[in-house]
Regions:
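Extracellular/surface recognition and adhesion modules
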Residues: 21-23, 52, 56, 95, ...
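Short, solvent-exposed loop/edge segments of extracellular or virion-exposed proteins
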Residues: 17, 53, 57-63
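Structural signature of tandem-repeat unit edges
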Residues: 70, 74, 89-102, 112-125, ...
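Boundary/junction segments of secreted and surface-exposed precursor proteins
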Residues: 41-55
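Acidic, glycine-anchored loop motifs typical of Ca2+
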Residues: 61-72
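Acidic, Ser/Thr
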Residues: 82-86
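Collagen/collagen-like triple-helix sequence repeat recognition
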Residues: 1-41, 117
Length: 172
C-alpha cells in the first residue's frame, strides 16, 4: 500500500485488542482507534499490550473499574516482582506514567519477549538485573527531562559485554 505522501505503508504494524485497533508507525508512534467509535476515557491509560494491562489492573486498580488511571499509576512507588519472569509481555511504553518510581531493580528480569519499554522520567537508577534475560529487548526509551543518574553495571559504550543491557538485542 502507498500512503498519501507516496511512502510505503507496508511497515506499519497493526494490532488489536477487544476494544481498540493500534497502528504502530515506523518512527514508533502508536495511533489507537476505538472499535466502538467512542473515544476512550482521557483519564485512563490505553495499554498497547493486553498482558501488561491485566497485570497492572489486577494490582494497582484502586477504584475497581477494571482500568488503570494516570493517577493510580502515578501512586505506584515499586513494581516489585510483578513482571519478573513473565514471557508474555512485549511492550510497556505505559510505564512512563508510573511517575512515582525512582528505581528499577530486577523488574523485567526474565521477560524474554519484552522488546520495547519507556522509562518514567523520575527513575534515577536502573540495576544490573533490570533487563537480565530480555533477549528480545530492542528499544529502551528515556523520557525528555529524565532524572536518570545511574545505570548500574554499564561499562561505557561496551555494555554488551556485561551489565544492565547484556544479553539484550540493543545495538546502541
Amino acid at each position: 500500500a502507498t500512503g498519501e505522501d507516496g511512502k510505503d505503508a507496508d511497515s506499519i504494524k497493526i494490532t488489536q485488542d477487544e476494544n481498540n485497533v493500534h497502528f504502530e508507525l515506523t518512527d514508533g508512534t502508536v495511533i489507537t482507534i476505538s472499535k466502538t467509535g467512542q473515544s476512550a476515557d482521557p483519564n485512563v491509560i490505553q495499554f498497547e499490550d493486553e498482558n501488561v494491562k491485566k497485570l497492572c489492573v489486577a494490582i494497582w486498580d484502586t477504584d475497581g473499574d477494571h482500568e488503570l488511571s494516570y493517577d493510580e499509576a502515578a501512586k505506584v512507588t515499586t513494581l516489585g516482582a510483578t513482571f519478573k519472569g513473565n514471557t508474555e509481555i512485549q511492550l510497556f511504553n505505559e510505564l512512563q506514567h508510573f511517575t512515582g518510581l525512582a528505581a528499577l531493580d530486577d523488574t523485567f528480569s526474565g521477560c524474554s519477549n519484552l522488546w520495547r519499554v519507556t522509562i518514567p522520567v523520575n527513575v534515577e537508577t536502573i540495576s544490573t538485573t533490570t533487563f537480565n534475560g530480555c533477549s528480545q529487548l530492542k528499544r529502551v526509551i528515556f523520557e525528555k527531562g529524565s532524572k536518570l543518574k545511574l545505570i548500574a553495571g554499564s561499562s561505557g559504550n561496551n555494555s554488551k559485554t556485561g551489565g544492565t543491557f547484556s544479553g539484550t538485542a540493543l545495538t546502541s
